Amino acid sequence: MQDQLQQFRTLVEQNLIDRSLVQKSFFFFEAGSNDIFNYFLPSNTPKPDPHAYVQAMLVEVETFVDQIYKFGARKIALFSLGPVGCVPARALLPGAPNNRCYGKMNVMVKEYNLGLESLVEHMHIKYPHAIGVYGAIYNIVQKFRANPTHYRKPLSFHIFYS
């Protein structure tokens, strides 16, 4: 994320992107799924407790918003994470259930999402003339998971090997 931000900063500072265009543009942000998933990977490095880890992630998001705001961004959408603890790869993690979602992981996701929502709610105070939008993805995904046939016929996949 920092590399992309640096590239964007360079374009703005070199006037390769007009600031008025930046002010009219929409900025969509969704990040954090891999961070939460990776928190549960085995490691010899000590980890902070889950709350501290999520708070550090939220500081990174706020830093990102600070920086794009300074470059002229005024329309910013932050999207929540979906239920990371329900991805099939979670079954590969030590101690994770393979027949249901990984609750500990989704607790972190929900805390992170609440922090994002709070950031958007207070955006107008910290960032004058900015418009913040929160995209609540988690609940939408959970509705699809709970009742998939309500939204669409189930898909069937055929895999062919050659």
Enumerate the predicted regions with their spans:
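Mobile gating loops/cap/lid regions near enzyme active sites that modulate substrate access
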Residues: P83-G103, S118, H122-I125, H129-S162
